[in-house]
A protein has these predicted regions:
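Non-catalytic signal-transmission and effector/linker regions of two-component phosphorelay proteins
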Residues: 1-9
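Conserved acidic carboxylate
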Residues: 12
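Amphipathic alpha1 helix at the N-terminus of the CheY-like receiver
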Residues: 16-27
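Acidic, metal-coordinating helix/loop segments flanking the phosphotransfer/catalytic sites
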Residues: 22, 35-55, 63
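Hydrophobic alpha-helical motif in two-component signaling modules
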Residues: 48, 57, 70-73
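Acidic phosphotransfer microenvironment of two-component signaling modules
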Residues: 15, 39-43, 74
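Short amphipathic alpha-helix used as the core "switch/output" element in two-component signaling
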Residues: 66-80
Length: 80
């Protein structure tokens, strides 16, 4: 019986880093299922509405800000 995969959302605003991280998860971590990627906060919240992951890999400096990533973390804990 195959083990259930854990669901991952990757949030990164640098496209090369986003795609590289996604490829690592898809090819090197067989227990992970990337259920979505986002380059903006708005894209991230849309993904969360579609389904809550087990893991969010989040760029804390999203959009060049030093607070957006931290605010997203706080809101995840408040909502979920």
């Amino acid at each position: 019986m195959e083990a259930k995969k854990f669901k991952v959302i990757i949030v990164e605003d640098v496209k090369l880093e986003l795609k590289g991280t996604e490829e690592i998860f898809r090819h090197e971590i067989p227990d992970a299922e990337v259920i979505g990627t986002a380059m903006t906060e708005q894209e991230f919240w849309s993904l969360m509405e579609a389904g809550v992951p087990d893991l969010v890999l989040l760029d804390l400096g999203l959009g060049g800000s030093t607070t957006i990533g931290v605010d997203i973390c706080r809101n995840i804990f408040k909502r979920y």
